[in-house]
Amino acid sequence: TLIHEWAESVIGDQYPVPDRILHFTELIVQDYLAQEMCDRRPPKGTFDLFATEGGTAAMCYLFDSLQENFLLNQGDAIALMIPVFTPYIEIPELRRYQFDVTEISADQMTPDGLHTWQYKDEDIDKLKDPRIKALFITNPSNPPSYALSKETTERIINIVKNDNPNLMIITDDVYGTFIPHFRSLMAELPHNTLCVYSFSKYFGATGWRTAV
């Protein structure tokens, strides 16, 4: 039962089974992500969940796993949508990765000269290049905290479906719960997307170090 599972995990008297995330905890988190990351309209099936000790740890595991499984190799081309959480800038520069990074900047302006923190179509179209194997994005952005516009989201979806179907998307949606009716790219492109979500920001519990 749920209470038995939680009691054993608090006591820590044995290894967790399954080791990636506890059974009943996974069911709860699946529903939570469907509500908060998919605006209550999740894709068919279920997400493969892995509990981690915080969002930053999840990032490190993702980079490592992508390379160890030969999905990304040293020197491969990736795209980075900026502004972005700082480690996404620093990790690709490490010697073991040395990725060829294409930066896509949120520098779209209004006619009045105000910053919208959104992306130009011609910059998003860089993702059509099949040499770009992965796209890293913080959505909503960090620190501006603006979610991708509907138009940009649809453009990325069309690029994946029509131009670069093997593009891997790594989206860090930690602040998604602060956006009304937020819908992650993992809800739109579940077979291409790896999502990092941390509970710490929304629940004000950064010291807990809990994420999926």
Please annotate each region the language model reported.
Residues 4-164, 176-190, 194:
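Conserved core of the PLP fold type I
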Residues 188-212:
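Active-site PLP attachment segment
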Residues 169-170:
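Residue-level marker for buried hydrophobic side chains located in beta-strands
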